[in-house]
Amino acid sequence: MQMTDTVKKILANYEGENPGVKGNLARMLMTGKLAGTGKMIILPVDQGFEHGPARSFAKNPLGYDPHYHYQLAIDAGLNAYAAPLGMIEAGADSFAGQIPTILKCNSANSLMSDTAGKNQAVTATVQDALRLGCAAIGFTIYPGSDMALDMFEEISEMRAEAASVGIPTVIWSYPRGEAITKDGETAIDIAAYAAQIAALLGAHIIKIKLSTDHLENKDAKKVYEDQGIDISTQAKRVEHCMQAAFGGRRIVVFSGGAAKGSDAVYED
């Protein structure tokens, strides 16, 4: 498929990047039902790590099989499939070339103490991504956690290594931790800040949560009110978060959030 002008315009925003990085970005942007539109939907399947197998897959036992998720992403016409090392390896041969993959390089689990600092363990490498033909690496950061600075340093090093071999980086920027309230995790000022941090760390694709109109930080709240920043609708909040990602020069995707009914999804 010939690359569209829309995709060419997006790639032009990634100045200073090598052809390998841009080629892999194009590979994802030109795949699936949204190919060429500049829009992107990624299927992320790391729930087994985060929540355990029964909580993740018991309602649909087919989900225990990694091949199911590959095929789901292909059949749905998505742009890419993201998962931890073991799941990507389990279908790498059977589905080679059929769907771009994103290797999730760090993960957490729900067996740890609630008092442990919010953090994730590095569980895969850039060399794994190369070996498996992945289109990108993925990494989660927790702005607001006491461990956030360590996470920033980890992804900075991994991002540099990945870019040197032509692999883009997707950063899941999910605010949480000791310095942020539960409502603050999806507050618009915090969501925009999370997008900015990911962009500053060099993310080629930024994944954040859809935000509410809550303003968490009192200093930021004053600026939002004084400057009349419109955060009244979901569309305006999405627009503002994209503005925080270098004025729309970086691809931003949004997490689906908590489980909800079809009507709520359509309303979003």
Residue ranges and their predicted role:
Residues 1-46:
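N-terminal basic, low-complexity leaders that serve as flexible interaction/assembly modules and, when applicable
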Residues 1-2, 35, 40, 47-256, ...:
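Alpha/beta enzyme core
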